[in-house]
């Protein structure tokens, strides 16, 4: 891995949820890119565990591994559950709810974004006005 850590394509796109990885002590993982984007937007949006993450190896063993590619499915599952619970919400509304449930939402930055989302908090927020 090189020394470049800045967010780039496709993670810097508008209207997407960019997920960074944190270690077990909730610190930005050394391989996880940071913002801002070229036009100054905060990225990553949120963080999830990705260092280490238990995964199934090609041989069927459970092994620890690292990567934002392991953090992203955790958040994708959260988004899918929220959207299933609130099918009338737009993608933008769901993503905003996820961001606002992050433990860093009061002061988002370009290292942790809005922080680690809280599923229960996001669910309560999403369903509060869901008719």
Where are the regions a protein language model picked out?
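Hydrolase catalytic cores
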Residues: 50-112, 116
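Substrate-binding/active-site groove segments that recognize
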Residues: 44, 117-118
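Secreted peptidase-domain scaffold signal
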Residues: 121-131
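N-terminal low-complexity, intrinsically disordered patches enriched in charged
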Residues: 29, 76, 122-124
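Short intrinsically disordered coil segments
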Residues: 33-36, 61-63, 68, 131
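Catalytic-core segments of hydrolase enzymes
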Residues: 1-56, 99-101
